Amino acid sequence: VEWSSSERSTITSLWGKVIPAEIGPVAFARVLIVYPWTQRYFGNFGDLSNIAAISGNAKVAAHGKVVLDGVDKAVKNLDNIKGAYTSLSLLHSEKLNVDPDNFKLLGDCLTIVLATKFGAEFTPKVQAVWQKFLIVLIHALSRQYF
């Protein structure tokens, strides 16, 4: 994919304001709450029985940060997201057997959390660039499935 200098600037500027340990847990908890069938991949996380349990779960919070660290890897490798995500794609497809449709659900939840966090700064233009970035990221993460 080709990124214009404006798109690169938008992605890196937005991402530069993100604190993975703050945003990640909220976005990942939202996935588990809004799409409860995704909980099946996290049976070892303990109590995921309700919103309070999920929101207060240390393993959910830790994994949310890990997920955002993965997004950070894509931001730092805009010119080769597919290459940067090869091992993550293999892990999710071959070892964890995660349904790749769940990556879009996570992207949607992350977008909602970012829009909530940044309010008026998360303009339609910023969102359009962010969505383009997520499409590339999700495609790279889903690559080993096909």
Curated annotation (Swiss-Prot):
Q: Which GO terms describe its biological process?
A: hydrogen peroxide catabolic process
Annotated tissue distribution: Red blood cells.
Q: Which SUPFAM superfamilies match?
A: Globin-like
| Coiled-coil residue windows | none
Q: Which InterPro entries match?
A: Globin, Globin-like_sf, Globin/Proto, Hemoglobin_b, Hemoglobin_oxygen_transport
Q: Which residues form the Globin domain?
A: 2-146
Which residues does the record give as heme b binding sites? Answer: H63, H92
Q: Which UniProt keyword terms apply here? A: Heme, Iron, Metal-binding, Oxygen transport, Transport
Which Pfam family is one of this chain's hits? Globin
**Gene3D superfamilies tied to this protein:** Globins
- Tell me which domain of life the UniProt entry assigns to the organism this sequence originates from: Eukaryota
GO MF annotation list: haptoglobin binding; heme binding; metal ion binding; organic acid binding; oxygen binding; oxygen carrier activity; peroxidase activity
Tell me which GO cellular component terms the UniProt record holds: blood microparticle; haptoglobin-hemoglobin complex; hemoglobin complex
User: What stretches pass through the bilayer?
Assistant: none
- Partners and quaternary state? Heterotetramer of two alpha chains and two beta chains.
Q: What does this protein do?
A: Involved in oxygen transport from gills to the various peripheral tissues.
Report the family membership.
Answer: Belongs to the globin family.
In its miscellaneous comment, the UniProt entry states:
This fish has two hemoglobins: cathodic and anodic. Cathodic Hb has high oxygen affinity, low cooperativity and displays a small reverse Bohr effect. Anodic Hb has low oxygen affinity and cooperativity and displays a normal Bohr effect.
Q: Which PANTHER family match?
A: HEMOGLOBIN FAMILY MEMBER, HEMOGLOBIN SUBUNIT EPSILON
**What is the recorded name of this protein?**
Hemoglobin cathodic subunit beta
Q: Which organism is it from?
A: Gymnothorax unicolor (Brown moray)
